[in-house]
A protein has these predicted regions:
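Conserved mixed alpha/beta catalytic, RNA-binding, or beta-rich assembly cores of soluble enzyme
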Residues: 1-36, 40-42, 122-128
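Alpha-helical scaffold segments in soluble metabolic enzymes
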Residues: 23, 52, 94-98
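C-terminal edge-of-domain segments
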Residues: 94-97, 101-128
């Protein structure tokens, strides 16, 4: 299972989010059809850009609770002091990817920033 964790500023466009996801996949040598889901914080439940990007990529959006983000936050590789102050986790993208991919997940692509979107990839043996 491959999950793209996404973080973004409010009203980030679907093309910007999709570009970040595709760049993370390319950096990892993966095609778009390897992706099983996009994960983000539950506070982004109404973010149209994320929903549209997921639809274009043919995957579901997994909303991750604050508690799940915090639990996965210990396994992140990168750190943004700004994001930590706002959300309580060092990287929303990395924590969301890890949380959605499951307890045995590992990061295969740390947080990548493209414009106002960030994307990280996590992999696990879990079924999507």
């Amino acid at each position: 299972m491959i999950v793209a964790g996404v973080g973004c500023r409010r009203n980030t466009s679907a093309p910007d989010i999709e570009a970040a996801v595709r760049a993370a996949l390319a950096r990892s040598g993966l095609a778009a059809d390897a992706l099983d889901a996009i994960a983000t914080t539950a506070s982004k439940h109404d973010e149209a850009g994320i929903e549209t990007a997921a639809a274009r990529l043919g995957v579901a959006v997994v909303l991750v609770s604050e508690a799940e983000l915090e639990a996965a936050g210990e396994r992140t590789q990168t750190r943004s002091e700004r994001v930590l102050a706002l959300t309580g986790v060092p990287s929303v993208a990395e924590a969301a990817a890890l949380a959605a991919a499951g307890p045995s997940a590992r990061l295969i692509s740390p947080r990548l920033v493209i414009g106002s979107a960030t994307c990280a990839l996590a992999a696990s043996e879990a079924a999507p």
